[in-house]
């Protein structure tokens, strides 16, 4: 097995730019463009919320399926062929094409179909760029690369929404800007970053596949690991409930004009992101020093729950700002310390990468379920109060489920996975 050499600043810079483009084109439509595109008149605004939940739901499902499939196919590239670059370029181009299609689409079905194409493209390119971390970086640089992915997520949503709002772009022009961004930066980064040909190694035998399947079942049977997964899933649903419908809440819950609501959405996103980053850094340091990740993870869910209570009790923009800060604090701490806690609980060191992938899928599933559930709750009561109450309750339930997982007596000193944290989801 060849020894991986450290990469330089150029590699890290290009890699970070690639992820900045990916996060920007993925999160800007979710938070701003799709809600504006699917928004309906005040007399029938609930149908717009339901349509948005539907579109985000089917898009998220497509992405969850496409990412692992694309990753597995790129792993199986023929001997001597490039494994990651073709998929990264193909995903970037597919994303750009369907962003344009989405911009010209009208109605929930057409927009939903086009958005599925976008999420598949994003998932394919994300899988390819993520694989570069394991392919090309030594263990001493993987944490830095993962931190670059996470920080670019935080910057990406602010950058995307900020460009559209501050430049005064319409919905279609916003999509065209995003398409150009991913086409240029995504493909450019894929061409610049090295992609060594697939090594000459025999394919895994069928028996190994069977053993992997058995070990997967064993991971789910591990008591503490299973409780942690359930807690992570439910907490992420609570986070998605509290953040996915922010623009609709400003428009129809607080009855703000569209231009004012867009400006205020940008402000909420900046506040949320600032506190996510702050909490991530501080709690990461504290958890490394104390080792008591379980307690910190549970406390984070309590802070997240408080944000839902604030909006439900005091539905004003000022209270929403406070709630965004609390949500950022809670989820920033949960996403960082929660994954470090998950790393402590991984059942078998032979399956760390696979089991950590399962942990990350639970976060993605939560962000998929949240908008759909939120749209249903809005339709049920004709308002937003139940959405935020449910966000608070689910956050508390997530903390209770996490509490059922026992803190290991001696946390491993060799796992640097707390740096590979599941980064904050979009507000």
Regions found by a protein language model. Name each.
Residues 66-81, 279-292:
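Helix-to-loop junctions at the C-terminal end of transmembrane segments
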Residues 1-9, 196-230, 419, 423-427:
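Juxtamembrane intracellular "pre-TM" segments in multi-pass secondary transporters
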Residues 63, 143-165, 360-371:
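Glycine-rich segments within core transmembrane alpha-helices of 12-TM secondary carriers
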Residues 34, 124-137, 333-348:
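Intracellular juxtamembrane helix-capping segments at the cytosolic ends
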Residues 2-60, 226-262:
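Helix-loop boundary and gating motifs at the non-cytosolic
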Residues 84-100, 295-310:
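Structural signature of the two symmetry-related core transmembrane helices
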Residues 46-48, 83-85, 166-181, 375-395:
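A membrane-interface helix-boundary motif in multi-pass transporters
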Residues 350-380:
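A late C-terminal transmembrane helix in Major Facilitator Superfamily
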């Amino acid at each position: 097995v060849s020894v991986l050499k450290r990469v330089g600043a150029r590699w890290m810079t290009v890699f970070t730019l690639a992820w900045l483009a990916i996060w920007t084109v993925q999160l800007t439509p979710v938070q701003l463009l799709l809600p504006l595109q699917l928004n309906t008149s005040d007399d029938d605004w609930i149908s717009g919320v339901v349509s948005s939940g539907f579109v985000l739901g089917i898009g998220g499902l497509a992405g969850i399926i496409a990412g692992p499939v694309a990753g597995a196919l790129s792993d199986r590239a023929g001997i001597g062929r490039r494994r990651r670059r073709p998929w990264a370029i193909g995903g970037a181009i597919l994303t750009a094409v369907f962003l344009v299609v989405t911009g010209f689409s009208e109605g929930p079905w057409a927009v939903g179909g086009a958005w599925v194409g976008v999420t598949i493209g994003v998932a394919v390119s994300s899988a390819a760029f993520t694989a570069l971390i394991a392919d090309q970086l030594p263990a001493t640089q993987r944490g830095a690369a993962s931190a670059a992915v996470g920080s670019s997520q935080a910057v990406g949503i602010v950058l995307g929404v900020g460009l559209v709002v501050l430049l005064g772009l319409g919905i279609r022009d916003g999509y065209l800007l995003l398409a150009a961004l991913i086409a240029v930066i995504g493909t450019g980064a894929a061409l610049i970053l090295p992609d060594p040909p697939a090594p000459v190694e025999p394919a895994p035998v069928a028996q190994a596949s069977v053993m992997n399947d058995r070990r997967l079942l064993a991971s789910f049977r591990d008591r503490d690991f299973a409780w942690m997964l359930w807690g992570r899933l439910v907490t992420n649903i609570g986070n998605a409930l509290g953040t996915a419908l922010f623009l609709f809440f400003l428009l129809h819950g607080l009855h703000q004009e569209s231009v004012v609501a867009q400006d205020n959405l940008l402000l909420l996103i900046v506040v949320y992101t600032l506190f996510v980053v702050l909490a991530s850094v501080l709690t990461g340091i504290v958890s490394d020093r104390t080792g008591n990740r379980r307690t910190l993870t549970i406390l984070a869910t309590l802070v997240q729950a408080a944000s839902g209570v604030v909006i439900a009790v005091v539905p004003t923009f000022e209270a929403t700002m406070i709630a965004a800060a609390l949500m950022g604090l809670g989820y920033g701490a949960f996403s960082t310390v929660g994954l470090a806690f998950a790393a402590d609980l991984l059942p078998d060191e032979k399956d760390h990468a696979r089991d950590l992938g399962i942990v990350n899928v639970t976060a993605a599933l939560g962000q998929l379920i949240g908008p759909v559930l939120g749209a249903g709750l809005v339709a049920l009561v004709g308002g937003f109060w139940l959405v935020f109450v449910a966000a608070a309750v689910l956050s508390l339930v997530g903390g209770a489920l996490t509490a059922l997982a026992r803190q290991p007596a001696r946390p491993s000193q060799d796992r640097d996975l707390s740096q590979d944290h599941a980064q904050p989801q979009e507000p």
